[in-house]
Each structure stands twice: as structure tokens, then as C-alpha cells.
């Protein structure tokens, strides 16, 4: 639970955060350049807005907004959002999070969205450890990868998820982001 002190600490911390962190999109409307994936009428946008997201693998080059989209999902959902990095995560970490998710679901009916950044870096056994939880909807998996998931992610996970491809930003998109960073109070406009 946030208190007056944690709000103050968060405000102070955000003052020294890197520009990219301060400018990270907070809503789907702030996410730039991915209208095909999250534009008006897309299934993903509808699922996020209705808080009815099912497992999804976000696939695209670095810098396309995969992690930002996951953070927008975190802000938009009533579910508990848990983030795991495939670089340092272990099978025991995953099992602990899945056990906690199952308890939350059983005790309070609260769903868990498990965000696995760089899911392609998990080995086969680590990916297999997610299968039961995804299959039984103990967690809603949101995986992010720069690699083609059809080659790098367990086919059983792929078959239980939707794959959404994010595309590189256009020059116009990058220009819009730079202007926003210069003018927005969270960016350089607030300095």
C-alpha cells in the first residue's frame, strides 16, 4: 500500500530517472507507432481495455515498445502484474511466482499477469515450467522477444498464446517522441 512517504519517494526518484524511463508511455494512447497492434478496434487494445487479456507473445525489434506495452498493461489491469527477466530468472523463480499466482487466484479470484522479458533466452526447461500455468490460466503470460517466437519459443506456449508483431518506428514516430520529450513536463519541458 502506498503511503504519503512512498508517493514522495517515488516523486523524488522520478526526478533523477533517465529520460526514457520518465517518458515511458502510461496509456495505450501514449504508445507511438503501433496502431496495427494496439490501435482502435484491435483485439489487443480491446482485451486490455476490458481487462480480459489472454496470453500473448510480443515480438519485434529492440525499441519498438514491447516492454512499454507490458507496463501499460500493468497500469491498465486489475490483475497483479509480475515481471521476470529471462536473463536472470530461474525455474525456481518461475515456480515461486506461479505458486503465488495460484494462491491469489484461489483465495481472492485475482488474476496474475506474468511478464517475461526476453522470453527467448529461457531454455526449453524454463519455458516448459510455464506451460501448466498458462494452460490452466493460473497466469496470463505476456512474453517479449526480439527473436522470431516460432523458432525460439516453445511451440506449446505459442499454441496457447497470441503472437503480436510490433514494427520498427518510422522517422515520423521518432520525431513525435522527441517533440514529446522536449515539451512534456515528465521530460525536458518540466525542467
Specify the residue positions occupied by each region the protein language model found:
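A short hydrophobic beta-strand->loop->alpha-helix junction that borders the nucleotide-binding pocket
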Residues: 60-61, 82-90, 145-146, 166
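Conserved catalytic/switch belt of AAA+ P-loop NTPases
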Residues: 45-49, 116, 120-159
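Conserved small helical "lid"/interfacial subdomain of P-loop NTPases
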Residues: 170-191
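A short, basic N-terminal segment
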Residues: 1-50
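Walker A/P-loop
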Residues: 2-12, 46-84, 99-102, 131-136
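Conserved beta-strand position immediately N-terminal to the Walker
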Residues: 29, 56, 164
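Conserved AAA+ ATPase "SRH/arginine-finger" region at the nucleotide-binding site
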Residues: 85-87, 162-175
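Short glycine-rich substrate-engagement loop in P-loop NTPases that contacts/grips substrate
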Residues: 37-42, 79-113, 124
Amino acid at each position: 500500500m502506498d503511503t504519503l512517504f512512498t508517493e514522495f519517494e517515488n516523486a523524488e526518484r522520478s526526478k533523477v530517472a533517465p529520460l526514457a524511463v520518465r517518458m515511458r508511455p502510461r496509456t495505450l494512447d501514449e504508445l507511438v507507432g503501433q496502431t496495427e497492434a494496439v490501435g482502435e478496434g484491435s483485439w489487443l487494445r480491446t482485451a486490455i481495455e476490458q481487462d480480459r487479456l489472454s496470453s500473448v507473445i510480443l515480438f519485434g525489434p529492440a525499441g519498438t515498445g514491447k516492454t512499454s506495452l507490458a507496463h501499460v498493461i500493468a497500469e491498465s489491469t486489475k490483475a497483479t502484474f509480475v515481471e521476470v527477466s529471462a536473463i536472470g530468472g530461474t525455474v525456481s523463480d518461475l515456480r515461486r511466482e506461479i505458486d503465488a499466482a495460484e494462491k491469489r487466484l484461489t483465495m481472492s479470484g485475482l488474476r496474475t499477469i506474468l511478464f517475461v522479458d526476453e522470453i527467448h533466452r529461457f531454455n526449453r526447461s524454463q519455458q516448459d515450467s510455464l506451460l501448466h500455468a498458462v494452460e490452466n490460466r493460473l497466469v496470463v503470460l505476456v512474453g517479449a522477444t526480439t527473436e522470431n517466437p516460432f523458432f525460439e519459443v516453445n511451440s506449446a506456449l505459442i499454441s496457447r498464446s497470441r503472437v503480436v508483431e510490433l514494427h520498427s518506428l518510422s522517422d515520423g514516430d521518432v520525431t513525435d517522441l522527441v517533440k514529446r520529450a522536449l515539451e512534456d513536463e515528465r521530460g525536458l519541458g518540466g525542467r
